[in-house]
Regions:
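Active-site-adjacent structural elements in enzyme catalytic cores
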Residues: 1-215
């Protein structure tokens, strides 16, 4: 069974948090933070079965704040997509494509222009461990200690795809794209790559790709 993340109304629903965990949960990036299960009391075991950790996040947009303030309890949160498919962008597509998965829809009049999964992080013994770098952190540049004389485009692998632009001493990672066996995911990869190249006025001198299948 795939583990699920939960959203809690505020920090009062958690206990024994380390200072860095509190800082991450309340940061503007608002990632999912993996916490030891004892820090999240009164949660059903089947949300993250056979695991020692559970993903937790706080509301990060007005609709989420209104929803969590109304129900005043933790809610399971997952992306609006069928397995292997990218999240849908429009309300009408959600109603059409997810009718076998959802009983009710809470819709919004603000269109989604760019897909971005929730970032996933944990506090490790030696600092922050980023498991999925996406919403809240992308497209921030990552400073590097070395300098590149070429513009490099790294297209990544076919599974769990993420691409990267390398210029001078900066790396620019895309958000998590997904498994490129799916045609819609490949379209998302192409659209995001074009957007990043436009934003950063980036033209690659070298293109790298991991061609090992199933990686």
């Amino acid at each position: 069974t795939k583990p699920l993340a939960i959203m809690v109304p505020d920090l009062q629903f958690l206990q024994d948090l380390a200072p860095q965990e509190t800082e991450l949960l309340t940061s503007s990036a608002a990632p999912i933070v993996l916490l030891a299960k004892h820090k999240v009391p009164n949660i059903a075991d089947n949300i993250a079965p056979h695991l020692q950790e559970i993903g937790v996040m706080l509301p990060s947009n007005p609709l989420q704040h209104l929803l969590l303030r109304t129900v005043n309890r933790p809610l399971v949160m997952t992306s609006a997509n069928a397995s292997g498919q990218p999240p849908v962008l429009k309300n009408e597509y959600a109603v059409e494509q997810l009718n076998d998965l959802a009983d009710f829809y809470l819709c919004h009049n603000r269109d989604i222009l760019q897909r971005a999964d929730d970032s996933l992080v944990r506090v490790a013994f030696d600092g922050l461990e980023t498991l999925r770098r996406a919403r809240g952190y992308v497209p921030d540049e990552i400073p590097l200690e070395t300098q590149s004389t070429k513009n490099v485009l790294a297209l990544g692998s076919d599974l769990k795809n993420t691409f990267c632009l390398l210029r001078h001493n900066k790396a620019i990672l895309s958000q998590h794209i997904g498994d490129t066996a799916n045609e819609q995911v490949r379209s998302q990869l192409s659209e995001n790559l074009a957007l990043f190249q436009q934003i950063y006025q980036f033209k690659p001198d070298i293109i790298a790709v991991d061609t090992h299948p199933g990686y």
